[in-house]
Regions:
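Class I SAM-dependent transferase core
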Residues: 30-97
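A short glycine-rich, Lys/Arg-flanked "PGG" loop and its adjoining helix->strand segment in the class I
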Residues: 111-112, 178-193
Length: 246
């Protein structure tokens, strides 16, 4: 004959075992709720992220190699700098910013166009590149170039002092693009235009999808006014033009 467990175990031991089972269930439910809460950012964390301009995507390591790659004779044909400057409204007397200036490829071309009545700010976070641009400007007798050692999130441009800005194949390297764009906007005159030339990519492959750039620029207070594909027309490179939203 089989006897039930109630007849085998004392009632107080049964009570103890039951209590342990209930405690285990409650602990499991609490752990699950805690894990679910930790998986989702708190409202405060989300607000802090928005205010800081943080992004959640990969970026490329800033280029720090030889500058000769920027001086390919075919680059003018591919990128059409004069057409870029026409679109951005660069003319005699304009103040222009070349953010991520590198070898100064665009800097010197803009300096020739704006003449001695204008200024071209060559901004880079690499001191060696700026030294190269200073030597180049002296060699080419361009007295209207000013070099600026910027920060990763701030080009350190003069407030309301720029008529046109260009980020040429630089945006995919910027770790805090929204913060940098906000500080760039502060340097722009009322009618100034910002041009961003880059290539479609994943962020860490020296490219970033243009739709990502547009959304981040909008978060920073810009509005898209036009886009072009004449810079290396290969369905990869793009040229976006923004102005500060009013």
């Amino acid at each position: 004959m089989h006897r039930s467990i109630n007849s085998i175990l004392p009632w107080n031991l049964l009570f103890f075992v039951s209590a342990l089972v209930l405690l285990g269930c409650a602990t499991a439910q609490y752990t699950t709720r805690t894990n679910n809460l930790s998986a989702s950012p708190s409202p405060a964390a989300t607000i802090a992220q928005e205010e800081s301009g943080a992004i959640n995507r990969p970026t490329s390591k800033p280029y720090a190699g030889e500058l000769s790659i920027f001086e390919d004779p075919k680059r003018d044909e591919k990128l059409q700098p004069n057409r870029i400057m026409d679109i951005l409204g660069v003319k005699q007397g304009s103040n222009v910013a070349d953010i991520g200036a590198g070898s100064g490829w665009f800097t010197v071309r803009a300096a020739r166009r704006v003449g001695n009545g204008g200024i071209v700010y060559a901004v880079d976070i690499n001191r060696e590149y700026l030294d190269y641009i200073e030597k180049r400007s002296k060699r080419e007798r361009l007295i209207n170039i000013r070099v600026i050692l910027g920060k990763e999130d701030d080009p350190l441009l003069p407030q309301k002092g720029v008529d046109a800005l260009l980020l040429l194949k630089t945006y995919h390297e910027i770790a805090q693009p929204i913060r940098l764009l906000k500080r760039t906007r502060a340097a722009m005159n009322a009618e100034a235009l910002l041009g961003i030339i880059d290539r479609n990519g994943k962020g860490d492959d020296h490219g970033v999808d243009k739709e990502v750039v547009i959304k981040e620029a909008e978060r920073a207070g810009f509005m898209l006014v036009n886009q072009y594909d004449f810079v290396k027309p290969d369905n990869v490179d793009y040229f976006l033009v923004f102005r500060a939203a009013r």
